[in-house]
């Protein structure tokens, strides 16, 4: 396995660990989720370039589009929650309540 793949896999693992450690804050969770998506994007580009899958060049772009949509929805949720409650602690929120 090349060193670039090991580094990107390590970045994904660190973002996943950050997601588990900082799960009480919404902003930290969104940043870790974005790091996971970007490392998955780079890994998919490397995989496609190494295996010469010319047909599936659209898959990393689709992943990047979904990551942008996820970030936009997450930031909108963060703004709504911080305007309503004044904090971003996930543990204190009950979003299922009307």
From Swiss-Prot:
Single GO MF descriptor: NADH dehydrogenase (ubiquinone) activity
One Pfam family per UniProt: Oxidored_q2
Keyword annotations of the record: Electron transport, Membrane, Mitochondrion, Mitochondrion inner membrane, NAD, Respiratory chain, Translocase, Transmembrane, Transmembrane helix, Transport, Ubiquinone
EC number of this enzyme: 7.1.1.2
Cellular compartment(s): Mitochondrion inner membrane
Keyword Cell cycle tagged: no
GO cellular component, one term: mitochondrial inner membrane
Root EC class: translocase
Membrane topology of the entry: Multi-pass membrane protein
Reactions mediated catalytically: a ubiquinone + NADH + 5 H(+)(in) = a ubiquinol + NAD(+) + 4 H(+)(out)
GO process annotations (BP): ATP synthesis coupled electron transport
Residues passing through the membrane, by range: 2-22, 29-49, 61-81
Gene3D superfamilies in alphabetical order: 1.10.287.3510
Record-linked InterPro entries: NADH_UbQ_OxRdtase_chain4L/K, NUOK/Mnh_C1-like
Primary residence: mitochondrion
Function as written in the Swiss-Prot or TrEMBL entry: Core subunit of the mitochondrial membrane respiratory chain NADH dehydrogenase (Complex I) which catalyzes electron transfer from NADH through the respiratory chain, using ubiquinone as an electron acceptor. Part of the enzyme membrane arm which is embedded in the lipid bilayer and involved in proton translocation.
Self-association and partners: Core subunit of respiratory chain NADH dehydrogenase (Complex I) which is composed of 45 different subunits.
Similarity annotation: Belongs to the complex I subunit 4L family.
This protein's name: NADH-ubiquinone oxidoreductase chain 4L
Native organism: Lepilemur mitsinjoensis
Lineage summary: Eukaryota, Metazoa, Chordata, Craniata, Vertebrata
């Amino acid at each position: 396995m090349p060193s670039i793949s090991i580094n990107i896999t390590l970045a994904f693992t660190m973002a996943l660990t950050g997601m588990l450690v900082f799960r009480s804050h919404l902003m930290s969770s969104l940043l870790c989720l974005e790091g996971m998506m970007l490392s998955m994007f780079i890994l998919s580009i490397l995989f496609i370039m190494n295996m010469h899958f010319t047909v599936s060049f659209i898959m990393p772009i689709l992943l990047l589009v979904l990551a942008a949509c996820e970030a936009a929805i997450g930031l909108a949720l963060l703004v709504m929650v911080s305007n309503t409650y004044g904090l971003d602690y996930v543990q204190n929120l009950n979003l299922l309540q009307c």
